């Protein structure tokens, strides 16, 4: 188990019990150095080209839905400093970034992205925080942080935040490749593709698939309303 501790328990417990203040404080502490870390190819955040691969796949998915995306908005769930939203915003009518960390949101707002808003909030409340969107994106293995029970709640929230024919793309840690990568934290939840697809169906998505080769540390879920 990771050495990360809190006065209210281990890191895994903090997420599983949805201790949102403790989670926010954890990410607040990383906000000022987050983009610098992502710019370092040796950083664990870039293990297996996670960020670059996510954005490339999302751009291809958007290109196949160009007209649909152009008349709808996009929600970045767990947006951090707004890097993903900055990559895709031009393809959508509007964008919203939601993150639990006030300091992350402060950095995101400083980008002054046109037609975008950044709000402090948690991803369990997407339908009440945002207008319904054509796409919900989430990069940062959000479900692997929160675990199965809370992850299911996030999927339900994402489904409720979408317009008909809208789509969700999020990444998750791949159980099948867990032993093949140097950075394999024990305090995260690793999912099989079959499991994550079943969770998406329970959340009400009509079409679900996973994207990525079986040896990838993180796979992507594509779920369509």
Regions found by a protein language model. Name each.
Residues 2-115, 120-127, 149, 169-224:
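Class I (Rossmann-like) S-adenosyl-L-methionine-dependent methyltransferase catalytic domain
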Residues 71, 132-133:
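Local beta-strand N-terminus motif with an aromatic residue
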Residues 137:
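A conserved beta-strand element that flanks and buttresses the S-adenosyl-L-methionine
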Residues 140-144:
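Short catalytic micro-motifs in class I SAM-dependent methyltransferases
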Residues 152-164:
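A short glycine-rich, Lys/Arg-flanked "PGG" loop and its adjoining helix->strand segment in the class I
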